[in-house]
């Protein structure tokens, strides 16, 4: 029995002079919740399209459920459920009508299709009143739930989720996270692509960090943060962040890195400083910030996160976006 549901071996994909995916190899074990992380332009979308069979690799092989995707494309499609980032639903239909339409595309019909639709509507936790409304009246979170349900109609073993919580408010994001956890507990193998490191830390037991077409780190969130020797992050909320402030903090002895970070929940921009000895150099940091005429509104000490690991490995933030590949 094959223990890996996804096997990517030396995959490269070129678009004329651009190498979008560069000699990538990785495995996703059966029942794993695997995160593929990286900024726009990292090559995540191209790799996902190759996993779905939408485009072919320039070189290398991909297997899903033990089947080579180029030799057995129809078998792989039976095994895969794909949830794209964009909502793929018909606005003028209600939830049940949408699921009926997509179920027929999978070859389902009659009582089997009706029963499966009712199972999935129960899974989405939408009430009957909502189910009867047109999709055009749904919130973003409700649309995402039906989008996921549509990908589950044929009971796939492997589920690909492309940025499933993009654009959702915190409440709907947490609801989607719970759906993903439930699917994984049922034994589904899930590969989640995201640029949100907190999402990967919360959900995934294995992650690959991708940048400029390459896998630059692979392991559990704990393993990856342990690889970083710096133990602490100092998060400072200043009254303003200027280039002079950034230069001043980067010159402090003992500072490994300093960078801007945007807190999506609080809607504020903070200054993050990575160091091995936070308590020792905190007075120097306060002095440097004051010297450039900046006021400190708050200071917080925390552990290294996956986003901090990414910045240390690449030298840039996830929000320094490039064109998606």
Give the predicted meaning of each segment.
Residues 5-7, 17-20, 281:
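Conserved beta-strand immediately N-terminal to the Walker
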Residues 276-325:
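C-terminal coupling/interaction segments
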Residues 179-276:
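ABC transporter nucleotide-binding domain
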């Amino acid at each position: 029995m094959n223990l890996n549901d996804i096997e990517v071996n030396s995959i490269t994909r070129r678009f004329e002079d651009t190498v979008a995916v560069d000699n990538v190899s990785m495995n996703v074990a059966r029942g794993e919740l695997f995160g593929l992380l990286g900024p726009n332009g990292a090559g995540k979308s191209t790799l996902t399209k190759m996993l779905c069979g939408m485009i072919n690799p320039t070189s290398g092989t991909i297997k899903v459920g033990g089947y080579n995707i180029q030799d057995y494309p129809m078998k792989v499609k039976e095994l895969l459920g794909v949830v794209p980032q964009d909502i793929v639903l018909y606005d003028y239909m209600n939830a049940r009508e949408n699921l009926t339409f997509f179920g027929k595309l999978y070859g389902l019909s009659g009582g089997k299709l009706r029963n499966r639709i009712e199972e999935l509507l129960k899974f989405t936790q939408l009430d009957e009143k909502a189910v009867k409304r047109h999709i055009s009246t749904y919130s973003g979170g409700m649309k995402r739930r039906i989008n996921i349900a549509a990908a589950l109609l044929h009971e796939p073993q492997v589920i690909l989720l492309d940025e499933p919580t993009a654009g959702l408010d915190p409440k709907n994001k947490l609801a989607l996270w719970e759906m993903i956890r439930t699917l994984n507990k049922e034994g589904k193998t899930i590969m989640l692509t995201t640029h949100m490191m907190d999402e990967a830390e919360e959900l995934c037991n294995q992650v690959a960090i991708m940048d400029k077409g390459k896998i630059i780190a692979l392991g559990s969130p704990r393993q990856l943060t342990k690889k970083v020797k710096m133990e602490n992050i100092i998060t400072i909320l200043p009254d303003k962040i200027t280039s002079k402030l950034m230069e001043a903090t980067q010159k402090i002895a003992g500072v490994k890195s300093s960078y801007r970070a945007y807190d999506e929940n609080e809607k504020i921009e903070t200054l993050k400083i990575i160091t091995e000895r936070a308590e020792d150099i905190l007075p120097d940091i306060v002095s440097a910030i004051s010297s450039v005429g900046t006021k400190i509104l708050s200071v917080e000490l925390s552990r290294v996160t996956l986003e901090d690991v990414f910045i240390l490995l690449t030298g840039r933030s996830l929000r320094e976006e490039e064109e998606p590949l």
